Structures are given as structure tokens and as C-alpha cells.
């Protein structure tokens, strides 16, 4: 997406995703944009904003996306737990076998560490 400079093409990428989301869930997709791979251009950010999207970056990620080289449970915890911080936006890829296996325990550990979880809608709402 970072190479898309044509607003119509950029918008089509997002509206196609919105359509797929609606088809899969029966709901409208929240207007948040995470630049794939964290790669973006100033033009992308401007177009996303003009289309009503809030751009959100992650503050913590690890190499969980490679299905042929999944981290072990121990490696995942060693990467994630010490790097977690207040306000963290943590990127966990849904295609990761390791993430699926450790998610319940990971969330429990974070709760035990005093963290709470909110949706992006909750984080950006006027409280």
C-alpha cells in the first residue's frame, strides 16, 4: 500500500477490505488503518485521513508472521513480556500457530502484570 499514490487505487484497497469484513462479520469495519509492514508514505497517511481513517502503528511486534519458522512458546514470552509497556499497541499476527497456542496464557500474564485491554475504539473515544 505504501507505493500507492493514486487516491482511487488506495481507496479501492480499503473499500474492498471493508466489503470483505462486512461479508464475513455482518458488521461495519472500524476506520483504523495499519500500514502493512509499518511501511508508509506521507501521501498514504494523508489519503487515509481524508477517507476518514485513523492511522495506528504498533509499538511492539516480533517475528511471528513466518509460518515456516514459528517461534517457540518460550521465545515468544521472552520477546513479548519484558518489552510490554503502558500504552503498548502489540501486533500479533493471526496466522501464527505460536500466538494461537499461547494467547490465553499471554493475556493472563499481562493481566497479572497489571495491564488491561481496550479496543482501539475505546482508546480513541472521548472519555
Show the residue positions of the predicted features.
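Alpha-helical scaffold elements lining the catalytic groove of polysaccharide deacetylases
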Residues: 1-25, 39-86, 99-101, 105
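A short coil-to-beta-strand element that immediately follows conserved catalytic motifs
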Residues: 27-32
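Conserved, mostly hydrophobic/aromatic
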Residues: 33-36, 48, 55, 90, ...
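Active-site-proximal beta-strand/loop segments in catalytic clefts of secreted hydrolases
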Residues: 34-38, 58-61, 92-96, 120-123
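C-terminal domain-boundary segment and adjacent tail
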Residues: 98-127
